[in-house]
Each structure stands twice: as structure tokens, then as C-alpha cells.
């Protein structure tokens, strides 16, 4: 099938690779290069980098609302466009241009977690499961009818990065199935009940309040890992906590217990991966070797 691909971050790359292997990708649309790193040099998106490695033409318009951009898009003569974490709103002329419309790969069980951060929000909310939906796009935010859906369990120690990688691979597999069965799929309108929105993650959500229950702090650490990274102050230094599990232990909220376990309002969490500023992530034994925490140490955020 003759396709346009529209995506930008790492999550989109496996989908691009799968489509390139099985279909004709006539053009790749992604966000333009932006300043990044210490030198603030323009850095292309992961999708642009991979598309160029594959020899695919790349476009990164700052808007798709101009008549010129819409004419260029339509002139590609694609049968369908596949969209995954692209980063721009698609106006109606773009949605209407491909013969079979635009298909979106969304990382949640719609209508739950429409919007920008569905993977983070599913873990933060303590959802038992999530999944991938292939959706026929329309003008609303993730409101289109669902063509195909697959569920997956969220593991008790799974982080955003873990789930991100699994769902990315699932999306690549599912879109191939959807494209192959497009003539037979029946669009299923999303129900009005159960709609929730996955707002962008704010950095203010990352500071840990140790008076909260262990179950909530466990979800906060896993649901913000690796970015922006839940953090606490230890010995006056900000430390990111990247992996954890709920554990037994008693003490005042924030008390550091043996083995880098920290007491919460109720229960405790065992930190299994931590990162000091300017350092790489470390497991507890290595972390404590270079950053000993004397008996009576406390974790806090202010």
C-alpha cells in the first residue's frame, strides 16, 4: 500500500520500520530539528534520523494549515496516512486527502486516556491494563472510531520506559494487521462513558511527598521514569528514583531504611535504581558505595 508516515519520537520508529518493510512509504512527516544537548545544536527527531537511514524522503513543516502544505501532502497520492505521536494537529483537508484517510496508533484503551501522555497516566493511575488502539482519525482529539484494539497487562514493577517499548512494538504489529484487513474492519465509535484525558506531565508532579502511601509513591516513581524522573533530596542532593518495588518496612515518612528502602506514610518502597545529578543510574549497592546514607538519614522534597 502507498503510505505517508507521520511521527516524531522513539515510540514511532518501530512503526516506521515495519511499514517500510511491508509497504511503500512515499514520504515521512516529522517535527523539525530542534536545539538539544549542552551545545544547543539542532537535533533531528528519531524518526527523521531513521527515515534518512532508510533512504526515505522527509518533510518537517511547522504547520499543515497552509494551502501550500496541504497541496504538497495531497500530491503524494497516498492511499492512507499512518500517524503515531506526530506532534501537529491535522486539519480536515489533510485528514481527507488520502483515499482511505488517516489511521492513528494510540497507546491506550480508548476512550480512556485520550491526549498527550497516555502511558504515564495509566501507570500513575494504577491501571491494571492498557493497550493499543488503531483509530480512524477525525478532527477531535483522539475521538475517532476504533478499527482494532489489543490489551496488555501492566506489570507491577513496569516503568513508563518498559511499557513504552512494549506498546511501540505492539503498535507496529497491529498496524500491519489493520492495513492488511482494512476492507473488512468495521469502525467502532467510541462510547461517551469512560472518557479521560492524559494531560502532559508537568515537572511539578515529580517531587515525592513521603507522607503518601507506598502504593502511590511506587506508581509515581514508575510512572515518571525515565522522564521527568521522580525525585527526592538525600543529604541535601537531588536524586532521581527510577525503579522501585513496594516493600516491608516501618519508620517515619522519608526515613531511609537498610538497602535503600524508604518509609512512606504507610508501608515503604525499595529503590532499585537511582541517579544522582550528573551521574549515571545505579543499583542500590553501587549507589550507596559512592553515596553512603548514615543511620537516621531522611528523604524529603523541601
UniProtKB/Swiss-Prot annotation:
<dbReference type="InterPro" id="IPR002376">
    <property type="entry name" value="Formyl_transf_N"/>
</dbReference>
<dbReference type="GO" id="GO:0005829">
    <property type="term" value="C:cytosol"/>
</dbReference>
<keyword id="KW-0648">Protein biosynthesis</keyword>
<dbReference type="InterPro" id="IPR005794">
    <property type="entry name" value="Fmt"/>
</dbReference>
<dbReference type="Pfam" id="PF00551">
    <property type="entry name" value="Formyl_trans_N"/>
</dbReference>
<dbReference type="GO" id="GO:0004479">
    <property type="term" value="F:methionyl-tRNA formyltransferase activity"/>
</dbReference>
<dbReference type="InterPro" id="IPR041711">
    <property type="entry name" value="Met-tRNA-FMT_N"/>
</dbReference>
<feature type="region of interest" description="Disordered">
    <location>
        <begin position="276"/>
        <end position="302"/>
    </location>
</feature>
<dbReference type="InterPro" id="IPR001555">
    <property type="entry name" value="GART_AS"/>
</dbReference>
<dbReference type="InterPro" id="IPR036477">
    <property type="entry name" value="Formyl_transf_N_sf"/>
</dbReference>
<comment type="similarity">
    <text>Belongs to the Fmt family.</text>
</comment>
<comment type="function">
    <text>Attaches a formyl group to the free amino group of methionyl-tRNA(fMet). The formyl group appears to play a dual role in the initiator identity of N-formylmethionyl-tRNA by promoting its recognition by IF2 and preventing the misappropriation of this tRNA by the elongation apparatus.</text>
</comment>
<protein>
    <recommendedName>
        <fullName>Methionyl-tRNA formyltransferase</fullName>
        <ecNumber>2.1.2.9</ecNumber>
    </recommendedName>
</protein>
<dbReference type="InterPro" id="IPR011034">
    <property type="entry name" value="Formyl_transferase-like_C_sf"/>
</dbReference>
<keyword id="KW-0808">Transferase</keyword>
<dbReference type="InterPro" id="IPR044135">
    <property type="entry name" value="Met-tRNA-FMT_C"/>
</dbReference>
<dbReference type="InterPro" id="IPR005793">
    <property type="entry name" value="Formyl_trans_C"/>
</dbReference>
<feature type="binding site">
    <location>
        <begin position="108"/>
        <end position="111"/>
    </location>
    <ligand>
        <name>(6S)-5,6,7,8-tetrahydrofolate</name>
    </ligand>
</feature>
<dbReference type="Pfam" id="PF02911">
    <property type="entry name" value="Formyl_trans_C"/>
</dbReference>
<feature type="compositionally biased region" description="Basic and acidic residues">
    <location>
        <begin position="276"/>
        <end position="288"/>
    </location>
</feature>
